[in-house]
A protein has these predicted regions:
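A short alpha-helical cap/connector motif
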Residues: 1-132, 139-160, 164-218
């Protein structure tokens, strides 16, 4: 999730994760619409590094919003790389299409409009074996998205998920006020499943919202 920069974030962004005009325009538009819930620039850079380190070519993004994270990732892909970006809200789909059209990597991004629960099975039918999934969508569905990833991300592939601290609710023994009990329970289940060392080599990077990174071992 994007946030007001601390001195540390400002330093990191200035050295390693400077936004160009396109990324800055996306961030500004989301802020204007009061939906600035995209990842930060430093997290975009981290996604690029993960893609490069794992030689990822095929990525599924669940929750695209205005395309900010998709563009960060697409820029790290090789010439034959591709992202399937799932976006549910029609307003967000339209926004993202406009920004993708301005991007030099627009041919590497296919936006899929609709409910991820309906779209993901169609991607499975294309053969699966994707190199990476980035999950940044409805938190209650994270276990369902992990179910899909377990079947469709290749062995050695990456599962990355944002907001896995659930606004700090994961540090509590019961759902705090403002967090639906089912959402709290499902996020705990998601995190605990990734902690299974027989299936994943995983951790949560302690960003303000928590960014889970897992290598699938099976």
């Amino acid at each position: 999730m994007s946030r007001e920069p601390t001195p540390a974030l400002e330093y990191i962004r200035s050295l390693y994760a400077a936004q160009d005009d396109l990324l800055a325009d996306i961030a500004a538009e989301l802020k204007k619409r009061n939906i600035a819930i995209q990842i930060g620039a430093e997290e975009g850079k981290l996604l690029q590094l993960l893609i490069a380190l794992h030689n990822a070519k095929t990525i599924v993004e669940i929750g695209t919003l205005a395309g900010y994270s998709a563009i960060w990732m697409a820029r790290a892909l090789p010439e034959d790389g591709h992202i399937y970006a799932i976006n549910k809200d029609p307003e967000h789909v339209q926004m993202a299409e406009g920004f993708f059209a301005r991007s030099e990597c627009r041919d590497k991004i296919t936006q899929l409009a609709g409910d991820a629960h309906k779209i993901l099975p169609t991607l499975s039918q294309k053969g699966g074996g994707f190199d990476m999934v980035f999950i940044d969508a409805d938190k209650i569905s994270y276990p369902a998205y992990l179910d899909w990833a377990e079947k469709n991300i290749r062995k050695g592939g990456l599962i990355v998920a944002d907001n896995t601290f659930l606004h700090g609710a994961m540090f509590e023994k019961a759902p705090p006020e403002g967090i639906a009990p089912t959402t709290w329970k499902n996020m705990r289940s998601f995190n605990e499943r990734l902690a299974d060392k027989s299936k994943y080599n995983a951790t949560i990077i302690p960003t303000s919202e928590g960014l889970s990174v897992a290598i699938k071992l099976f």
